[in-house]
Amino acid sequence: MTTLRLLISDSYDPWFNLAVEECIFRQMPATQRVLFLWRNADTVVIGRAQNPWKECNTRRMEEDNVRLARRSSGGGAVFHDLGNTCFTFMAGKPEYDKTISTAIVLNALNALGVTAEASGRNDLVVKTPEGDRKVSGSAYRETKDRGFHHGTLLLNADLSRLANYLNPDKKKLQAKGIASVRGRVANLVELLPGITHEHICDAITEAFFSHYGERVEAEIISPDKTPDLPNFAETFARQSSWEWNFGQAPAFTHLLDERFIWGGVELHFDVEKGHITRTQVFTDSLNPAPLEALAGRLQGCLYRADMLQQECDALLVDFPEQEKELRELSAWIARAVR
């Protein structure tokens, strides 16, 4: 009986793919070696301990329908589109060894005609006249009895979009999250014109089989049919939830300030697990009462634009004379936290 398992996703949904990865990892036998191949449509994927408001231009992501997905491994933020090929290697301990999976990817690239090498803890680079350029980044996760190594290969990614979503707005954030390290990157298509996702997947699969001396039929994972994986529905619900993708951010402080015709406003938010734990308001408005009331209402509120706007709008009942000012305030806060 083979000890290998090969899964290929035909979904471009990052929440679906990460839920599949999580379910396989949890339920795989300790003796199994798994290769999972997948890719995501426009998505920013952040590390387990990162703060999306710090790492990402969340406002532009919303405008461009770019999803946010938090993975269960550490590391930094990356932008995925269909020009990325994603891979995950899993194994039980003591079999799990990320140097083996790294070697498999390097062997796959070599078979395609690309000479790459490992650089630092997480990257694969190619030599060019301009210097080393990164073609792959990885992250890792280990539990007591198993581990996985997942990463991306830049195939034909739209590199111009990296800066659109990974360079955050100049927000006044003081956060404990891990800042992403930006590096010089290259697409494999620059080195191998005409290379496709299927070529990469075939090469990694062959290198995987060659290393272990076994072969196995691929299992195609599709969103058209719920995967036969234990607790998949619950895992997908969690992976796609605001509470996981945003609410798991490390504690941080966000300072907003704006000058309106009716006065200047400074808001200091302390946020933990996606909820506001404290709001301080400073203003030179002649009528600070609505703002003072807002500070009280926001205690415990989800740090989400629609929820903050809802609390601002609720003040209209108690302060109808300040409707114009409150609507301006509401719109500004919603824009600022997106």
Curated annotation (Swiss-Prot):
Residues 29-216 form the BPL/LPL catalytic domain. It catalyses: L-lysyl-[lipoyl-carrier protein] + (R)-lipoate + ATP = N(6)-[(R)-lipoyl]-L-lysyl-[lipoyl-carrier protein] + AMP + diphosphate + H(+). GO terms for molecular function: ATP binding; lipoate-protein ligase activity; lipoyltransferase activity. One of its GO terms (biological process) is protein modification process. It is found in: Cytoplasm. The keyword ATP-binding applies. Keywords: ATP-binding, Cytoplasm, Ligase, Nucleotide-binding. The keyword rRNA processing does not apply. It is an enzyme of class 6 (ligase). Pathway: Protein modification; protein lipoylation via exogenous pathway; protein N(6)-(lipoyl)lysine from lipoate: step 1/2; Protein modification; protein lipoylation via exogenous pathway; protein N(6)-(lipoyl)lysine from lipoate: step 2/2. (R)-lipoate binds at K134. Its EC number is 6.3.1.20. PROSITE patterns: BPL_LPL_CATALYTIC. Pfam families: Lip_prot_lig_C, LplA-B_cat. Monomer. PANTHER family: LIPOATE-PROTEIN LIGASE, LIPOYLTRANSFERASE 1, MITOCHONDRIAL. In the transfer reaction, the free carboxyl group of lipoic acid is attached via an amide linkage to the epsilon-amino group of a specific lysine residue of lipoyl domains of lipoate-dependent enzymes. Belongs to the LplA family. Catalyzes both the ATP-dependent activation of exogenously supplied lipoate to lipoyl-AMP and the transfer of the activated lipoyl onto the lipoyl domains of lipoate-dependent enzymes. This is Lipoate-protein ligase A. The gene is lplA.
